[in-house]
């Protein structure tokens, strides 16, 4: 069987020889071969079948390659052409076999073969027929994919067939919509004839001489072959068409002479010169030229020229007569001198070209215009115009010849330059190849010499130690990852017999090496085996990314993967992959290219009117001129590509998606893509750390850094996740490669999974503009075009990485494939969501650099899934400009200019909704109010809404509510509101920006401290809820106007004024800071003025307003979350001082953000928004901004010091000298005072506890909690008879670099003092008896430092429930029910449950009194309840899990969990034992026999839900939906447990009513934040 050399066998013989070899080796482990020695002796050896077949395949491909190169039809010698040639030859062999079958009287088989479908194939002039008999759908699709790949590489055109059934399936009847596949289109056809014709029409450039083997773009051929001959033929026709000459006798005659005739004509000529700024010049402006005066002059015109007497023959006389005949023209195409001016004038008059056209364009115009000279002559004859011998036709021909010669020279010069450039490039390529070959030859020679020397040394060592024992094994030892990949490949692709053969091959290799260690045959055999081994495993590792071959060694190193614990890991150490490095360089280059110049920005929000004209923005700078596409015919179209199929992605494999644009926008001139919207649905289980990296690139650029657009990394959760990627590029649909420009590169990674597993599905859409007119790009417009012209067809995108526009006239291929290599993650994940930065998924237990797994995004390129719009700094009332002075190092100062700039910032904040500080105004300043005006959809000026005059009582307790005003209700009041506020009655959409001005005049030395807070839901009706919200102090000790601005929150930040009575819009609450002024002669009045600022947006609903600012809090409920800077208010406490207070008295403030506001003597605590957030975690890290407000009389003065002691130290035993060594802040005051400063967070373990520890002593109060120490330096001092009582309020107004870690168990929110009995402080916990809890009487204990009213709820002890499926939601009672078959429940899906809503006397929202068996039992221990109830609005994706409580084996555990989402109140909330619930059309899932639980995803809506729901008629809009639960009635099924957990980002906006927790055990108290030292 051995074939020596290249045998001249035909293709059929080669195939037969190969098939015979495989048939002979089938079923054998070894096969004998003959070896011919140098002396002619023949030796027979037994070799493994695997090695024999490898040798056969190598010989087989070598013979086929020789035949392919020798084929005269072969034009391109490369690997892809060889694969296609081999495909066609095999088809030809199949046809030959069919022919032989017919010759051998096997007509039946041939007929069956034809009936199965003989597909025509044409390749280089040959036609083949390929049978599809026995092909399955998988093989047909694979063949189509291979044909499309070949067509893409070679430039073929293929036709896709819409068939749905193969002929071989034998189906005679087809259902509706199915099309049977004809035999000619079962596989895609490749038209070689069209390819050959297009190659002939291409330029005659030598393809083989180019440095690369790609095809050249086709260039139009010049029509220089038949152009001159055509013109000469036309001239010959005109010569032949002359009138026949009349034979006249030749005699000389005299022509009569004629005198010339002249006439005078009066004309007007404009004055072209004028004096401009003292200088004489010629203006170029057409408007100024038309304004210049004209002057008159007399011109002489020659009517008839002088004709002298000429002696000529009679023939000439006849010619002159014919020439003067107006009815007959004769063309004399002789050599005539024609001026260029006359030629241009003639061309313009004929309407053929313009003055500004180039020579090549003029030639194209002449060649495309059907110039009919006879028609022109006839027209002139009809006009009866006398013409000289130099006719117009001759001039036109002369001009045409000159222009053609000029254009031909230009084209020839261009071709010569292009050919020279290609020649130089080819020479440079050859020189580079030669240099690389020389270097490679030197390197290989050096390596050979080193290998020879090493082999010689090793042979000497082996020869010396041959008697000592067997020779060592010097075979190739594969690395760990190579062995793993090879085993996986062998298990999939090899049969058991083949695996056994391969194993025997390696054993025989080792035996032969030991048996004949010193022979050359053994050495060659070992080397050959090592080479084959390396090649085989190189192919197995790189099978997915390299072409299938057995003779090509892998050139790139294997990818780095993580090995299991305890196994050896081979390969290179972890380094940055080439794909990651290229993408990182691309991002850095894109930022540098698109960085705005001085004084301009490419992504600047609008500073002028927000909605100046029908929702269009005008805030572009000059650097964005290339995106300012102006359409000539004003054709504007909002583009949204939605008809895109859903694509599936597999784990660990990068997939590139080219977004087609020509199919829908092929008739548009230009296309501006602003944003790319993607929706990703995860297919993995919740909790698995899996991420998806999505890179968007523009393939029309040469380098990745030029075409890089964005890179986004998403963590895959449950349900659909939507994300918007700003792009901002302009493409041209007429470009032939437009469907391959915009590219999505998607890569999934994370926890190690099996390659090929489906992990996610993706759906994308585009948002932008399409222009039908020809676009133009200009920096400015002419003055004449700006008159009465509105530019309404330009839209500004606020975000986006604007890339320079690129065209592809000279491009051969789009941007090459860029791989994003990665390494799997392990351990817990860490979520990063900074407002102005990036999003990344990092590893918690991995020593390698986590930035190599996924690339961190800069802020200039894109935003992540939860990043907010890059808006300016938030309007925070606690941010002031701080100045330095010698007396006090930290004195707050107010700057009117800075406050005005921050107040006018549009959109507010990305994290905080926005509150601003107050600006002081002089009492003598008279304010001028102008009549406002409205234009379009935005207010141009501030408008006044209403005015209130509030009487201030002379005495008021601390936190007493004085007044509450509903902003929209007061604005819509026809009695008290202003005229302008009545305009809001016809407004459907409103995005308000309120400004409230407070004016209060107090006597000297008096002070009336007031607090103001914005209540979004109107639920802040207790003292603790008002203090825990973001309030502001109004301290008026003299004439001062305080300004308070706020942007109300809502479901979408867009409000409706007509819904003000329903509670949408919020309330303005004014409450007291505690004061007493009994000596006033008359009550004081507080004047409140409400206005709408000019950046308020409103509309009628015809045009949608842009989405407003994002939620003030957004994060994922993971084990660790990085929130960055968060503007969140936490009330720490307040203390009282008076003149008799002890000098040096100390008070401690424990900064435990999760402790809440402790009141009623430690028997109750209120969890606001900040405490609810911190209660979800055990540790926090970062710094915070502390604000201290002193409420004092104007005649009172004093000073305190605030120290920062280290955590874990007993601050009680610090002396004053030791305290002065700590960081401290001095706060003196005279009258009212305020200060804010930043406190750095530090701990000996790097983290602080969010809650106080359970058992602590007086010596170690703070442990790991942050704390403050307040020392009274000077007690409050005042004049005799005055009040010296003051109150100091401590609040945290901002957190910086905040990171939360280690999710906490919610039942351990509070801790007690040592030796006190610990009791579960939470309610609504399911007990086994399922009975109503009994209320207990409470003992009200007033805190001397904080007197608050009693807001208590009943408490009982409870059991701890499991958290296997997330947070506990509710328990639904089952059991027996006479005459009923099913238990049916309807529960509102809301996370804002409160104790007074579903406490001991209510169930759900039906207000039904409880009996002995409680049917529905909600749980307030759910962390979502705690967090979402503290906010005004929330939005989150929820995963509900239903677990059956009962005996599954005895009864059929049938349970249905469904979702009802309809505004029709078809079902009421509560319990029913007779009705039949159905969630058809929505989401539903059922639980059958043998299953223990069922899950249901409830997606979030496009608007936020209210945290507190009071109106049952609006549950559809204020909840996510209604949950339906249905299960069988049986004594074995006691009930069902319902769990819930978030599966995506949690968004919370506004301050709502938090949870108020009370205690009943006398031995248990809560540790307050502020206490007095022992």
UniProtKB/Swiss-Prot annotation:
Descriptive protein name: RNA2 polyprotein
Annotated segments matching region Disordered: 557-579, 863-916
Coiled coil ranges: 361-422
Residues at the site labelled Cleavage: 913-914, 1357-1358
Phylogenetic placement of the source organism: Viruses, Riboviria, Orthornavirae, Pisuviricota, Pisoniviricetes
Gene3D superfamilies per UniProt: 2.60.120.20
Annotated Gene Ontology cellular component terms: host cell plasmodesma; viral capsid
Posttranslational modification: Specific enzymatic cleavages by RNA1 encoded picornain 3C-like protease in vivo yield mature proteins.
Keywords for this protein: Capsid protein, Coiled coil, Host cell junction, Transport, Viral movement protein, Virion
Cross-referenced Pfam families: Nepo_coat_N
SUPFAM superfamilies named among the record's database cross-references: Positive stranded ssRNA viruses
Keyword DNA repair attached: no
Record GO biological process: transport of virus in host, cell to cell
Superkingdom in the source lineage: Viruses
Function recorded in the entry: Capsid proteins form a capsid enclosing the viral positive strand RNA genome. Together they form an icosahedral capsid pseudo T=3 with a diameter of approximately 30 nm (Potential).
